[in-house]
């Protein structure tokens, strides 16, 4: 089925391009999300008329995504899951769980924009999850899956201390560079 993209989609193409996709993908995902329309002569002429407006809208979404990406930079999420003695969790971690935790922390992210990179999280440990905020903005966040609340609290304290020390080092480096610049 030929469709016209109404926004940039990393795996398909750019705004305004006519691409061929499977009918089910178009009907069940692209059309309901208003990411594409069927490629007809009418829609092609409408799109040409609306192209400028759509491009402005896309730029606004990109700017919002970049702002959200800054707030998610160096973000980590700690999940507490029941697990066996060998570290295998009962069930698996889902994108909905991660999105729910991020929402509790004030970040509104659709679970469909989270990607585990082709793996399923079924063991305790540290994992990278990509958050696709826009077709051009993908932010990695770290997921820690732990067994108990005690482990989670210890991990949070260690991570926060590391972030504070990194921030202090960056400030010291900036102050040192500023002082070196004043001497010349």
Curated annotation (Swiss-Prot):
Which GO cellular component does the record give, naming just one? ribonucleoprotein complex
Picking any one GO biological process from the record gives: translation
UniProt keyword Zinc present? no
Disulfide bonds, paired cysteine numbers: none
Query: From the UniProt record, which GO molecular function terms apply?
Result: rRNA binding; structural constituent of ribosome
Coiled-coil residues are none
Ranges of compositional bias, category Basic and acidic residues = 173-184
Q: Matching PROSITE patterns, A to Z?
A: RIBOSOMAL_L9
Q: Which UniProt keywords apply?
A: Ribonucleoprotein, Ribosomal protein, RNA-binding, rRNA-binding
The segments labelled Disordered in the record are 160-184
Q: Which InterPro entries does this UniProt record tie to the protein? A: Ribosomal_bL9, Ribosomal_bL9/RNase_H1_N, Ribosomal_bL9_bac/chp, Ribosomal_bL9_C, Ribosomal_bL9_C_sf, Ribosomal_bL9_N, Ribosomal_bL9_N_sf
Q: Tell me the protein family, please.
A: Belongs to the bacterial ribosomal protein bL9 family.
What does this protein do, in the record's words?
Binds to the 23S rRNA.
- Protein name, entry field: Large ribosomal subunit protein bL9
| Taxonomic lineage from the root | Bacteria, Pseudomonadati, Pseudomonadota, Alphaproteobacteria, Rickettsiales
Q: Tell me what gene encodes this.
A: rplI
């Amino acid at each position: 089925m030929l469709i016209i993209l109404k926004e940039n989609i990393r795996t398909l193409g750019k705004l305004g391009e006519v691409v061929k996709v499977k009918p089910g993908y178009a009907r069940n995902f692209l059309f309901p999300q208003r990411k594409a329309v069927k490629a007809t002569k009418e829609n092609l002429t409408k799109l040409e008329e609306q192209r400028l407006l759509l491009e402005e809208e896309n730029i606004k979404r990109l700017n919002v995504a970049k702002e959200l990406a800054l707030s998610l930079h160096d973000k980590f999420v700690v999940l507490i899951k029941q697990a066996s003695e060998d570290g295998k969790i009962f069930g698996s971690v889902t994108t909905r769980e991660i999105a729910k935790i991020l929402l509790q922390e004030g970040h509104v992210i659709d679970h469909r924009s989270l990607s585990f990179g082709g793996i399923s999280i079924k063991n305790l440990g540290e994992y990278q999850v990509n958050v696709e905020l826009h077709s051009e903005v993908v932010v990695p966040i770290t997921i820690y899956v732990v067994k108990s609340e005690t482990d989670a609290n210890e991990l949070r304290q260690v991570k926060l201390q590391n972030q504070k020390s990194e921030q202090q080092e960056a400030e010291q480096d900036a102050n040192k560079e500023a002082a070196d610049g004043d001497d010349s």
